[in-house]
């Protein structure tokens, strides 16, 4: 029923050159995103004021359902406790999976983020820093095959296009990891820091703080 209804809507919109986007996806309906142009969901990464980011497994489920199509978040949280540091972590984690971080309100009705200049002006530097990189990898296109391995279980890798590899330290500790590429590479540049890591036997060494990320541009 859901598939048939969504498919009918898609066909109707395509016939008039319109796009289809659905909130609350995919949920358990993994079969819906292939019919959509854009998927997204409301989310809250705080539990009674404590930081509880979306897990790597949850991100990967959404990304695998959507393939290389756009995915958007609306953060529905208490903006009194979602400080600038947590907003930056939100954007960093979204970058790793090529998803777009947005904001709404704690109760999806009042106290809208973008009606409060104190909030969005505080976070403007984070928007300006991370959104262009998220757009970069999203346009490059997610690839389910990373062609790279990290020697630490705390490290998550995602591939976008032929050039880009995103890296997340999904732990509470600083991690020094070796990332080995299955292709022949000369070096990898972290576009977030400008630092270049020379490769030895197609392997680079990378040090990341807790919940920190890297956006590597691979040079063959």
Where do the model's predicted regions map?
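Generic detection of short hydrophobic beta-strand segments and adjacent strand-loop junctions
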Residues: 175-179, 197, 204-206
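C-terminal beta-strand-rich structural cap/linker in extracellular carbohydrate-active enzymes
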Residues: 200-220
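Single, function-defining residue in the core of a domain
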Residues: 43-44
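Surface-exposed amphipathic alpha-helices with a cationic face
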Residues: 3-18
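Solvent-exposed beta-strand/loop surfaces of large extracellular or lumenal domains
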Residues: 187-203
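Active-site-proximal substrate-binding groove within the catalytic cores of carbohydrate-active enzymes
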Residues: 16-18, 25-26, 32-35, 39, ...
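Generic beta-strand structural signal
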Residues: 158-160, 197-199, 208
